[in-house]
Amino acid sequence: IQAAVFSSGVIVFGLIAAQLGLVLLISATMDKLAPAMALGLFSVYAALMGVTLSVIFGVYELGTIGLAFGATASIFAGLSIAGLTTKKDLTRLGPILFASLLGLIVASFANLFFQSSALEWLVSIAGVIIFMGLTLYDSKKIKEMTAKAVVQGDNLAVSRIGAIGALKLYLDLINLFVFILSIVGHRK
């Protein structure tokens, strides 16, 4: 099934477009969505991401995938805990990380044309750094937003923050994993 899905560029493009569309839909309508609907859309997104990421098992050696996953899990857990426990104000990081992410996207698209292994390596290193920062920033921001909603007694906001927070941290985790895998990866 995996070979059939990924042998068609149209299907791959459709999977990626569906993921992007769901992220944009969830982000744009979070204030209006019922929490159950938001979590349902997040679940659909996670399933689509799982199908898309399954290609790594055909490209990378299993040991490399395990190494990248272990490194990702350790880094992600450490940065999430740091974000939840730090007393420092991280709000200034938000715009810097967002601008860096836009630059990363531009560089990634440019490398589709240049096919430069050096640029691919630089993009991967930058991606790890950016998503480490986003993990720290998002963890802190989700904690602060949740605390504010709890103080206000807004249970609906707490549920919505939980759904969008899950999506943000999931995206941070997956992207961190993909960039770490790209750095340590031994292709078959």
What are these regions (language model features)?
Residues 1-188:
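A hydrophobic alpha-helical transmembrane-helix feature that marks the membrane cores
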